[in-house]
Amino acid sequence: MGAMFNGLLFFPITPYRSDGEVDLAELAAHVRRGVDAGAGGVFVACGTGEFSALEPGEYAEVVRTAVEAIAGRVPVFGGAGGPVRTARRFADRAKDAGADGVLLLPPYLTEASGPGLVGYVREATREDLSAIVYNRANARFNEDSAVAVARLPQVIGFKDGAGDLDMMSRIVRAVRDEGTNPSFLFFNGMPTAEVTQRAYRAIGVPLYSSAAFAFAPRVALAYYDALERDDLATLEALERSFYHPLARLRAKGAGYAVALIKAGVELVGHSSGGVRPPLTEVTSAHRDELARILAAGLAALPEQVAAR
């Protein structure tokens, strides 16, 4: 079992119509644009896709729409999480909608021990559907619990959103040394992951999610290509002009990890429909700042990329 990812990972937004309902036609166009641009995998209805704001029927439609739009070109994963039985129902809906797997988000408003987290993963996932476990917020794994979930046949990967490089380095080593699954995958799931990806790559985490890809695919792909080529000059130019300013802007508003991406999609001429509560819209001043950051990132592209 397992889906193979080849390239940058795309986390689409969930667009809404003017009446507040999910805009499935715009979603299909959004994910097709991303795959056409070069995404190597699509994670729909996850954090950037406002999983927490979708009711189960909407979620199923979102996943099914993405699966049909992509038509097998790259793997499609849906989000799942919350209370353990609710998470399992979302996994069931993802399976029924044709997804290749789920990204398992943390349980709802509770602290848990390592064994408790392992139990959550076991009961929230399906043995016939690939799962990637998300280490963040109240779902913080250590070496022992990470090794235990890596032994579950349906768990193909581990994604870190905690940012503890010390612990993540030890988790990577522990899972690799344990050896149950040599093809087990590790992902950087930090907000604006490009800011930390050089550090994650150095400890054995080659895959990462790019929220910025949703509105700046040329910048995101140029950065990814520079990583693959060890092109330090391009990496530093894009970090200086685009990624570090974007991370600083993200820190200016609660929920901006999602709201900024939707604002960026609007900036490049596509509909997003805004965000659902409790998220709030980007201020007009911050929207202008985002436009300047995007322009600077495009201006910093290598000549051969800018000419495309």
What are these regions (language model features)?
Residues 31, 63, 91, 121, ...:
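A generic alpha-helix structural signal
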Residues 131, 155, 276:
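Glycine-rich phosphate-binding "P-loop"
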Residues 9-15, 37-38, 202-212, 216-308:
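C-terminal alpha-helical cap/extension of soluble enzyme domains
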